[in-house]
Every structure is written in structure tokens, then in C-alpha cells.
């Protein structure tokens, strides 16, 4: 759950590319 929350925030504030690759 923590990772998901962190990813969500990162995706919104940080580069979505990193999150997309990590999530995919």
C-alpha cells in the first residue's frame, strides 16, 4: 500500500515515465 501511495504521488509530482516503467 505504501508503495502504491508513493508511486501515485511521484507520478503526480515526479516524472510519470519512471513510474510507468516501474509499474509496467
Curated annotation (Swiss-Prot):
It comes from the Eukaryota. GO terms for molecular function: carbohydrate binding. Residues 1-18 have a biased composition (Polar residues). Keywords: Lectin. The keyword Glycoprotein does not apply. The keyword Cytoplasm does not apply. Residues 1-24 are annotated as: Disordered. Homotetramer. Belongs to the leguminous lectin family. This is Lectin. It comes from Crotalaria juncea. The lineage of its organism: Eukaryota, Viridiplantae, Streptophyta, Embryophyta, Tracheophyta.
